[in-house]
Protein backbone atom coordinates (compact mmCIF):
# COMPACT_ATOMS: atom_id res chain seq x y z
CA UNK A 1 0.00 0.00 0.00
CA UNK A 2 1.25 3.49 -0.86
CA UNK A 3 0.86 6.64 1.24
CA UNK A 4 1.92 10.11 0.12
CA UNK A 5 3.39 12.82 2.31
CA UNK A 6 3.16 16.31 0.84
CA UNK A 7 5.44 18.95 2.30
CA UNK A 8 6.09 22.70 2.12
CA UNK A 9 8.43 25.04 3.95
CA UNK A 10 9.29 28.73 4.09
CA UNK A 11 6.28 30.00 2.19
CA UNK A 12 6.77 33.43 3.83
CA UNK A 13 3.19 34.56 3.20
CA UNK A 14 3.43 33.88 -0.55
CA UNK A 15 -0.30 33.30 -0.93
CA UNK A 16 -0.27 32.90 -4.73
CA UNK A 17 2.07 29.93 -4.21
CA UNK A 18 -0.24 28.55 -1.52
CA UNK A 19 -3.10 28.86 -4.01
CA UNK A 20 -1.16 26.56 -6.34
CA UNK A 21 -0.56 24.12 -3.47
CA UNK A 22 -4.27 24.20 -2.66
CA UNK A 23 -5.23 23.47 -6.26
CA UNK A 24 -2.77 20.60 -6.57
CA UNK A 25 -3.75 18.97 -3.28
CA UNK A 26 -7.45 19.21 -4.09
CA UNK A 27 -6.85 17.30 -7.29
CA UNK A 28 -4.20 14.77 -6.22
CA UNK A 29 -4.29 14.26 -2.45
CA UNK A 30 -6.13 11.19 -1.23
CA UNK A 31 -8.05 11.32 2.03
CA UNK A 32 -5.33 9.45 3.94
CA UNK A 33 -2.37 11.38 2.52
CA UNK A 34 -0.45 13.72 4.83
CA UNK A 35 0.33 17.39 4.29
CA UNK A 36 2.96 18.97 6.56
CA UNK A 37 4.58 22.41 6.64
CA UNK A 38 8.00 22.94 8.23
CA UNK A 39 7.66 26.56 9.35
CA UNK A 40 7.88 30.18 8.25
CA UNK A 41 4.49 30.05 6.62
CA UNK A 42 3.78 33.54 7.98
CA UNK A 43 5.85 36.70 7.48
CA UNK A 44 5.24 40.15 8.94
CA UNK A 45 6.20 41.73 5.62
CA UNK A 46 2.68 40.71 4.52
CA UNK A 47 -0.14 43.20 5.06
CA UNK A 48 -2.43 40.27 5.69
CA UNK A 49 -0.21 38.97 8.51
CA UNK A 50 0.30 42.45 9.97
CA UNK A 51 -3.42 43.17 10.14
CA UNK A 52 -4.46 40.45 12.58
CA UNK A 53 -1.11 38.96 13.59
CA UNK A 54 -1.38 35.84 11.48
CA UNK A 55 -4.95 34.68 12.08
CA UNK A 56 -6.24 35.43 8.57
CA UNK A 57 -3.14 33.92 6.97
CA UNK A 58 -3.57 30.71 8.90
CA UNK A 59 -7.25 30.53 8.02
CA UNK A 60 -6.06 30.42 4.41
CA UNK A 61 -3.60 27.67 5.26
CA UNK A 62 -6.44 25.69 6.83
CA UNK A 63 -8.02 25.45 3.37
CA UNK A 64 -5.11 23.14 2.49
CA UNK A 65 -5.90 20.92 5.52
CA UNK A 66 -2.40 20.59 7.01
CA UNK A 67 -1.92 17.70 9.42
CA UNK A 68 0.83 19.52 11.33
CA UNK A 69 3.02 22.61 11.03
CA UNK A 70 6.40 23.37 12.58
CA UNK A 71 6.98 26.64 14.39
CA UNK A 72 9.44 28.74 12.38
CA UNK A 73 11.20 31.92 13.43
CA UNK A 74 8.63 33.99 11.53
CA UNK A 75 5.83 32.49 13.62
CA UNK A 76 7.88 33.16 16.76
CA UNK A 77 8.33 36.78 15.60
CA UNK A 78 4.61 37.25 16.26
CA UNK A 79 5.39 36.97 19.98
CA UNK A 80 3.93 34.81 22.70
CA UNK A 81 0.69 36.73 23.16
CA UNK A 82 -0.31 36.48 19.51
CA UNK A 83 1.06 32.98 19.04
CA UNK A 84 -1.09 31.68 21.89
CA UNK A 85 -4.16 32.82 19.94
CA UNK A 86 -3.11 30.63 17.01
CA UNK A 87 -2.66 27.30 18.78
CA UNK A 88 -5.98 26.04 17.37
CA UNK A 89 -3.88 25.52 14.26
CA UNK A 90 -1.81 22.32 14.23
CA UNK A 91 1.52 23.87 15.30
CA UNK A 92 4.15 21.58 16.79
CA UNK A 93 7.29 22.62 18.64
CA UNK A 94 9.26 20.52 21.11
CA UNK A 95 11.79 23.20 22.02
CA UNK A 96 9.97 26.49 22.64
CA UNK A 97 8.79 27.85 25.99
CA UNK A 98 8.13 31.19 27.63
CA UNK A 99 11.16 33.14 28.84
CA UNK A 100 10.53 31.87 32.38
CA UNK A 101 10.54 28.26 31.19
CA UNK A 102 6.79 27.69 31.40
CA UNK A 103 4.94 25.97 28.58
CA UNK A 104 3.23 27.98 25.84
CA UNK A 105 -0.48 27.17 26.29
CA UNK A 106 -1.89 24.97 23.55
CA UNK A 107 1.43 24.36 21.81
CA UNK A 108 2.12 20.63 21.38
CA UNK A 109 5.58 19.13 21.03
CA UNK A 110 4.43 16.17 18.94
CA UNK A 111 1.46 14.15 17.74
CA UNK A 112 0.90 10.54 16.76
CA UNK A 113 -1.21 10.15 13.62
CA UNK A 114 -2.52 6.83 12.34
CA UNK A 115 -2.89 5.72 8.74
CA UNK A 116 -3.84 2.21 7.60
CA UNK A 117 -2.99 0.79 11.01
CA UNK A 118 0.49 2.39 11.09
CA UNK A 119 1.39 5.01 13.69
CA UNK A 120 3.37 8.10 12.70
CA UNK A 121 5.16 10.12 15.38
CA UNK A 122 5.51 13.74 14.20
CA UNK A 123 7.76 16.17 16.13
CA UNK A 124 8.24 19.90 15.50
CA UNK A 125 11.43 21.91 16.07
CA UNK A 126 12.14 25.66 16.02
CA UNK A 127 15.59 27.24 15.42
CA UNK A 128 18.15 27.07 18.22
CA UNK A 129 21.56 26.45 16.62
CA UNK A 130 23.17 28.58 13.93
CA UNK A 131 24.43 26.91 10.76
CA UNK A 132 27.84 26.74 12.51
CA UNK A 133 26.18 24.92 15.46
CA UNK A 134 26.47 27.93 17.77
CA UNK A 135 23.83 27.33 20.47
CA UNK A 136 21.23 29.82 21.69
CA UNK A 137 21.67 31.80 18.48
CA UNK A 138 18.15 33.19 18.10
CA UNK A 139 16.97 33.92 21.62
CA UNK A 140 18.14 37.54 21.75
CA UNK A 141 15.31 38.27 19.31
CA UNK A 142 12.84 35.58 20.33
CA UNK A 143 12.86 36.66 23.97
CA UNK A 144 11.58 40.12 22.99
CA UNK A 145 8.29 38.32 22.37
CA UNK A 146 8.53 36.15 25.52
CA UNK A 147 9.56 33.00 23.65
CA UNK A 148 12.75 31.07 24.32
CA UNK A 149 13.99 28.10 22.28
CA UNK A 150 15.96 25.31 23.91
CA UNK A 151 18.40 22.65 22.74
CA UNK A 152 16.41 20.32 20.46
CA UNK A 153 18.60 17.29 21.13
CA UNK A 154 17.35 16.41 24.64
CA UNK A 155 13.81 17.37 23.61
CA UNK A 156 13.75 14.91 20.70
CA UNK A 157 15.54 12.22 22.72
CA UNK A 158 12.91 12.50 25.45
CA UNK A 159 9.97 12.26 23.02
CA UNK A 160 11.45 9.27 21.21
CA UNK A 161 12.08 7.48 24.50
CA UNK A 162 8.69 8.30 26.02
CA UNK A 163 6.93 7.02 22.91
CA UNK A 164 9.08 3.94 22.37
CA UNK A 165 6.86 1.13 21.08
CA UNK A 166 3.99 3.53 20.33
CA UNK A 167 4.94 4.44 16.76
CA UNK A 168 6.03 2.73 13.55
CA UNK A 169 7.61 5.69 11.73
CA UNK A 170 9.07 8.98 12.99
CA UNK A 171 8.94 12.34 11.21
CA UNK A 172 10.77 15.49 12.25
CA UNK A 173 9.38 18.83 11.05
CA UNK A 174 12.60 20.72 11.64
CA UNK A 175 12.90 24.46 11.08
CA UNK A 176 16.61 24.29 11.86
CA UNK A 177 18.27 24.35 8.43
CA UNK A 178 19.85 21.49 6.49
CA UNK A 179 23.38 21.82 7.90
CA UNK A 180 22.06 21.83 11.45
CA UNK A 181 19.81 18.85 10.73
CA UNK A 182 22.79 16.85 9.48
CA UNK A 183 24.60 17.58 12.75
CA UNK A 184 21.52 16.79 14.81
CA UNK A 185 21.22 13.45 13.03
CA UNK A 186 24.69 12.47 14.29
CA UNK A 187 23.65 13.19 17.88
CA UNK A 188 20.12 11.78 17.92
CA UNK A 189 18.62 8.30 17.86
CA UNK A 190 17.44 7.36 14.35
CA UNK A 191 14.63 9.47 12.85
CA UNK A 192 12.97 8.02 9.75
CA UNK A 193 12.18 11.22 7.83
CA UNK A 194 13.38 14.83 8.12
CA UNK A 195 11.08 17.43 6.59
CA UNK A 196 13.18 20.54 6.72
CA UNK A 197 12.95 24.31 6.56
CA UNK A 198 14.79 27.54 7.38
CA UNK A 199 17.80 27.29 5.05
CA UNK A 200 15.73 27.72 1.84
CA UNK A 201 17.62 24.84 0.22
CA UNK A 202 16.43 22.25 -2.26
CA UNK A 203 17.03 18.85 -0.71
CA UNK A 204 15.71 15.68 -2.32
CA UNK A 205 17.01 12.60 -0.58
CA UNK A 206 15.13 9.60 0.70
CA UNK A 207 15.30 10.69 4.33
CA UNK A 208 15.47 14.46 3.79
CA UNK A 209 13.19 16.88 1.97
CA UNK A 210 13.30 20.67 1.74
CA UNK A 211 11.56 22.70 -0.95
CA UNK A 212 13.46 25.98 -1.26
CA UNK A 213 11.68 29.16 -0.23
CA UNK A 214 8.07 28.24 -0.90
CA UNK A 215 8.94 27.23 -4.45
CA UNK A 216 7.99 23.59 -4.80
CA UNK A 217 5.87 20.93 -3.18
CA UNK A 218 7.73 17.99 -1.72
CA UNK A 219 6.18 14.56 -2.18
CA UNK A 220 7.47 11.55 -0.31
CA UNK A 221 6.00 8.16 -1.18
CA UNK A 222 5.83 5.56 1.58
CA UNK A 223 5.26 1.83 1.21
CA UNK A 224 3.23 0.25 4.01
CA UNK A 225 2.95 -3.48 4.60
CA UNK A 226 3.10 -6.03 7.40
CA UNK A 227 6.88 -5.51 7.57
CA UNK A 228 6.54 -1.82 8.41
CA UNK A 229 6.91 1.55 6.65
CA UNK A 230 9.57 2.34 4.05
CA UNK A 231 10.40 5.40 1.96
CA UNK A 232 9.97 4.48 -1.70
CA UNK A 233 10.50 7.82 -3.42
CA UNK A 234 11.09 11.53 -2.81
CA UNK A 235 10.57 14.28 -5.38
CA UNK A 236 10.10 18.04 -5.60
CA UNK A 237 7.04 18.93 -7.66
CA UNK A 238 7.01 21.99 -9.90
CA UNK A 239 3.40 23.09 -9.57
CA UNK A 240 1.19 24.41 -12.38
CA UNK A 241 1.18 28.20 -12.59
CA UNK A 242 -2.60 28.29 -12.35
CA UNK A 243 -3.84 28.64 -8.79
CA UNK A 244 -7.09 27.54 -7.20
CA UNK A 245 -10.12 29.76 -7.96
CA UNK A 246 -11.75 28.76 -4.66
CA UNK A 247 -8.62 29.71 -2.73
CA UNK A 248 -8.18 32.96 -4.66
CA UNK A 249 -11.73 34.03 -3.78
CA UNK A 250 -11.01 33.52 -0.07
CA UNK A 251 -7.68 35.31 -0.43
CA UNK A 252 -9.37 38.34 -1.98
CA UNK A 253 -11.80 38.51 0.94
CA UNK A 254 -8.97 38.17 3.48
CA UNK A 255 -6.93 40.91 1.81
CA UNK A 256 -9.91 43.27 1.83
CA UNK A 257 -10.49 42.58 5.53
CA UNK A 258 -6.81 43.20 6.28
CA UNK A 259 -6.78 46.51 4.43
CA UNK A 260 -9.87 47.62 6.34
CA UNK A 261 -8.24 46.77 9.67
CA UNK A 262 -5.06 48.65 8.81
CA UNK A 263 -6.98 51.69 7.58
CA UNK A 264 -8.65 52.23 10.95
Predicted region positions:
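Acidic, metal/ion-coordinating pockets
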Residues: 1-263
Amino acid sequence: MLLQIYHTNDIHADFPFLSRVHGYLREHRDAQDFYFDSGDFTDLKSVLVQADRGKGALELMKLCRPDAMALGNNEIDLGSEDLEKLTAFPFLCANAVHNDGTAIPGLKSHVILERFGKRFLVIGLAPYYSAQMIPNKYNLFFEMGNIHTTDPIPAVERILEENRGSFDFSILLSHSGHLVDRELEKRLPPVDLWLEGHSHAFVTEKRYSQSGKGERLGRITLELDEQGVRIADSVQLELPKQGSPAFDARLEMAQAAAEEILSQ
